[in-house]
């Protein structure tokens, strides 16, 4: 994107905020294009307070954002970690005061890799322990209250069936390698892997969504678009993809100590869910229909596009 286009987009998004009565300014505002669902501008108001302005990229994002708003209202009353406090929520714009802390990593779009704001090889004990504490608290949240607040609740048997159905759908529409398909089916068919309970999960837990303080302790979580009551293993999949099995075992140990609910094959289940992550990539690609996303999905599925 050229500087001119960036300026125009910043002006547009700041204009949307100002039309809602938020006195933010485009001077020194910054654009962040790394998210797949939102274009984001960071801008300050008359008092110097920094704000996050999110403009949905697609209509399906607008629909899911209303669910995210319900989730955040529930979390602000039930989770000690910091979460966004939406002050503006319209189909065109979401705005909230920027939270304290720094994302554990940003994303370099050109290099397609993380730009870290912390020591991550390996992550510090403070980071792992505080993340485990927050996950244990989140996953231990009362499900009945969550459901009554309007958060989607998926029973364990339904989550498993939905996973199997998604695999079939992706295979029919995009294809999948035989090796991957056989692995998925063994996992879906084996009761030993699957938990008999669901938990309130973040659903898209990776470094840009994790806020840390100057000592590397986790203080808050961003971007709750995928939150629901579902399989708790999902909140460990991206962590294991990035940091590996050994570090995930350390996180699970602290999670257990913090009161998180563990089962015998939990880490093996995480590994199998990780192997099925191409399904998530494919679902996004089928939703956006963008060539870049389709190609990414085909590669992850082990399908050659001729």
UniProtKB/Swiss-Prot annotation:
SUPFAM superfamilies linked to this entry: Protein kinase-like (PK-like) (SSF56112)
Q: Which UniProt keywords apply?
A: ATP-binding, Kinase, Nucleotide-binding, Transferase
A single GO molecular function term of this UniProt record: kinase activity
Report whether ATP-binding shows up as a keyword of the record: yes
Q: Key word Transcription present in the record?
A: no
Q: Which domain of life is it from?
A: Bacteria
Q: Name the residues annotated as catalytic in the UniProt entry.
A: 204
Q: Which family does it belong to?
A: Belongs to the aminoglycoside phosphotransferase family.
Which PANTHER family does the UniProt entry name for this protein? Answer: AMINOGLYCOSIDE PHOSPHOTRANSFERASE DOMAIN-CONTAINING PROTEIN, AMINOGLYCOSIDE PHOSPHOTRANSFERASE-RELATED-RELATED
Q: What is this protein called?
A: Uncharacterized protein YcbJ
Task: Supply the source organism for this entry.
Answer: Bacillus subtilis (strain 168)
> Gene symbol?
ycbJ
């Amino acid at each position: 994107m050229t500087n001119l286009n960036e300026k125009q987009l910043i002006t547009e998004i700041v204009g949307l905020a100002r039309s809602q009565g938020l006195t933010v300014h485009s001077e020194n505002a910054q654009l962040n294009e790394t998210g797949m669902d939102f274009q984001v501008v960071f801008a300050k108001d008359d008092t110097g307070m920094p704000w996050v302005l999110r403009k949905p990229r697609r209509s399906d994002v607008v629909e899911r954002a209303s669910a995210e708003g319900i989730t955040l209202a529930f979390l602000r009353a039930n989770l000690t970690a910091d979460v966004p406090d939406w002050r503006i929520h319209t189909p065109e714009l979401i705005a909230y005061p920027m939270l304290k802390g720094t994302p554990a990593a940003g994303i370099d779009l050109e290099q397609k890799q993380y730009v870290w704001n912390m020591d991550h090889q390996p992550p510090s004990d403070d980071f792992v322990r505080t993340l485990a504490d927050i996950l244990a608290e989140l996953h231990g949240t009362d499900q009945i209250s969550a459901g009554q607040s309007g958060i989607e609740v998926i029973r364990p048997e339904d989550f498993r069936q939905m996973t199997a159905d998604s695999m079939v759908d992706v295979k029919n529409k995009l294809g999948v390698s035989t090796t991957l398909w056989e692995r998925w089916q063994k996992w879906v068919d084996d009761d030993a892997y699957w938990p008999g309970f669901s938990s309130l999960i973040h659903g898209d837990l990776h470094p840009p969504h994790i806020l840390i303080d100057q000592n590397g302790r986790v203080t808050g979580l961003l971007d709750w678009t995928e939150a629901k009551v579902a399989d708790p293993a999902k909140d460990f999949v991206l962590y294991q993809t990035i940091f590996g099995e050994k570090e995930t075992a350390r996180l699970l140990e602290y999670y257990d100590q913090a009161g998180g609910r563990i089962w015998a094959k939990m880490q093996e289940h995480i590994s199998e869910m990780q192997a099925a992550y191409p399904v998530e990539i494919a679902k996004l690609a089928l939703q956006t229909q963008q060539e870049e996303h389709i190609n990414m999905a085909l590669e992850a599925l082990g399908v050659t596009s001729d």
